[in-house]
Every structure is written in structure tokens, then in C-alpha cells.
Curated annotation (Swiss-Prot):
The gene is rfcS. Part of the RFC clamp loader complex which loads the PCNA sliding clamp onto DNA. It comes from Nanoarchaeum equitans (strain Kin4-M). This is Replication factor C small subunit. Heteromultimer composed of small subunits (RfcS) and large subunits (RfcL). GO terms for cellular component: DNA replication factor C complex.
Length: 322
């Protein structure tokens, strides 16, 4: 079975959605057959890799594979491996009338500061024959000497209507049936948090089980509790029904295989929907931050979640004290 993220990946710059200013710049590079080193920054699944591939397709045509080297900083065994691969790749002349090749380094922010310094030297050494496109989720994790040597493009998350358009294209292409289109789109958008790649992978996993897609199946595959289920736990806790809230929470953790951190993240997303004042919401979020820190530091998940439910039940957030 073909992977849908590749099957439906745009091959042309014009087909990229939601990044209009970036598209204009990329098309200008194609017309001039020249470009600087680039840095694509933005959340996962917003089209950074797609943009790099589309640029390569339009610059090099059928010879794009010979002129485009894709590396992943998380997968490679170190900067020495990257240096060796770039050296071997840059040694051969470009095929066609574009006077440079492209090295695409994904997850560049995963490199240590020392490795990034080494990468900067590699970029300088091979700049005559090679252009680098670096991709990262966190722009702030890229060292300033690299930032100053690249043109930065910041990718924004997909807006919901663009997201809907792309999902519906896949639904039509694969002959899927959505039990309720609005609910399915909203659920996928909520689960993936704007990450289109994640949304497509979840949709494909659901389709392998049945051509009819339901909201329940999407959340089960994603191992995330539905928002209304988290709301019910919070409401019970805030009403002082500690044992009932605790029982419901344990059931959700078992049903979806959620860790303590997963639960905390789900609760954080629902706090702003609670019918309480903004200041009370801030107090709850502050408490959640403390609980999350303890869990990350190794404290028992259930003990910490119990403490949070009890804190909510006692109405501590109303007193503006911890």
C-alpha cells in the first residue's frame, strides 16, 4: 500500500497551500536559476519538506534526484557522516543548466551547537557548487552564525479551510465515507494540531480498518481522549466528585493508552473552555505546569494526577493560592 503522505504530496510549487509569500519567492528562484542558502522554520507538517522537493522538481526537472540530497540530522550518526555525504555529493557537477546542487537537511535544530558550527563551515566550503536548505521546528535553536548566512522562511500552520480542502481531496481519491464531515475534520484538526502529515497518517490508519471513518476511531488510533471526555473528568473534579473523576480518568488512560504527560496535555487544551474566569483558568494552568514538571522529573503519574483532581475539587483555583 502506498503511503498517502507521499501519494498526495504536491509536486509543483503552485500546488502548495497556505504559504503564498514563500511560493512567490521559490518561483523567483526557479526563474532566475539562482538562490541563497535557505532556512525553512515552522511546526511539523506545515510543508517544509514539500516546498524543498517542489523547488527541486521545478529547478531540475527529471534530473532532480541526481541534484538533490536529503539528509535528516536526527537520523545521521553525527556531523562527520553529514560532512562525508555532502563532500561526495558536491564532488560531481550538477546535471543540467542549473549551476548548483541542493542539500536539504531536515531537523537541523536537532544538531548540537558544536555540530551546527561544523555545519556552518561545511556550508561555506561547498557554497560554490551547493546550496543548503535547512529545515527546523524551532528557529531559536539555530545558532546566529547560521541564521546570518541564510534566507529565512517561516511556515505557518494550515488554516482549517485549507486543511479541509486537502483532507477532502484524499477522501475523494481513496473513496472514503465520512460519518460526519464537520466532526471528522474538526477531530483531525484537533488531534494533529495543524500537522497535516500527522492527520493524513491517522486518516490512512483509520481507512485500513474501514472505508467509513468515524470520530471515535480517529481518537482511538491517535491514543488521545476526546475533548468531551476530558471535559467530563474536569467537571466531576471541580464539583468535588473526586472518586468519580478519578475512576473516569483511569478508564480513559487504559482505553487510549495515555501517559500522565498525555493527560496533562489534553487537560491544558481544555482549560480555556471551562465556564470560569480567566484568572481562575490561569491559576489552573499554573498548577498543571507544576504537576507536569513533577511527572517529567520522574514522579508517579497517577499520584500527581490524583493531586490535581483533589486540588480542583477543593476549589483552590478560586483562592488564587496553590
Amino acid at each position: 500500500m502506498e503511503i498517502w503522505t507521499e501519494k498526495y504530496r504536491p509536486k509543483r510549487i503552485d500546488d502548495i497551500i497556505n504559504q503564498e509569500e514563500i511560493k512567490k519567492a521559490l518561483k523567483s528562484f526557479v526563474e532566475k536559476k539562482n538562490m541563497p542558502h535557505l532556512l525553512f522554520a515552522g511546526p511539523p507538517g506545515t510543508g517544509k519538506t514539500t516546498a524543498a522537493l517542489a523547488l527541486a522538481h521545478e529547478l531540475y526537472g527529471d534530473a532532480w534526484r541526481e541534484n538533490f540530497l536529503e539528509l535528516n540530522a536526527s537520523d545521521e550518526r553525527g556531523i562527520d557522516v553529514i560532512r562525508h555525504k555532502v563532500k561526495e555529493f558536491a564532488r560531481a557537477k550538477p546535471i543540467g543548466d542549473v549551476p548548483f546542487k541542493i542539500v536539504f537537511l531536515d531537523e537541523a535544530d536537532a544538531l548540537t551547537r558544536d555540530a551546527q558550527q561544523a555545519l556552518r563551515r561545511i556550508m561555506e566550503k561547498y557554497s560554490q557548487s551547493t546550496r543548503f536548505i535547512l529545515s527546523c521546528n524551532y528557529f531559536s535553536k539555530i545558532i546566529e552564525p547560521i541564521q546570518s548566512r541564510v534566507t529565512v522562511f517561516k511556515f505557518k500552520p494550515l488554516e482549517k479551510e485549507a486543511f479541509r480542502e486537502l483532507i477532502n481531496r484524499i477522501v475523494k481519491g481513496e473513496g472514503l465515507i465520512l460519518e460526519n464531515e464537520d466532526e471528522i475534520i474538526n477531530a483531525l484538526y484537533d488531534i494533529a494540531e495543524g500537522d497535516l502529515r500527522k492527520a493524513i497518517n491517522i486518516l490512512q490508519a483509520a481507512a485500513m480498518m474501514s472505508k467509513t471513518i468515524t470520530v471515535d476511531r480517529l481518537y482511538e488510533i491517535a491514543s488521545i481522549a476526546k475533548p468531551k471526555e476530558i471535559d467530563e473528568v474536569l467537571n466531576k473534579a471541580m464539583q468535588g466528585n473526586f472518586l468519580e473523576a478519578r475512576s473516569m480518568l483511569i478508564d480513559l488512560m487504559l482505553k487510549y493508552g495515555m501517559s500522565g504527560e498525555d493527560v496533562i496535555k489534553a487537560i491544558q487544551k481544555r482549560v480555556w473552555s471551562l465556564p470560569i474566569s480567566d484568572r481562575e483558568k490561569l491559576m489552573i494552568l499554573d498548577k498543571i505546569g507544576d504537576i507536569e514538571f513533577r511527572i517529567v522529573e520522574g514522579a508517579d503519574d497517577l499520584v500527581q494526577l490524583d493531586a490535581l483532581l483533589a486540588w480542583l475539587g477543593l476549589g483552590k483555583y478560586k483562592n488564587f493560592t496553590s
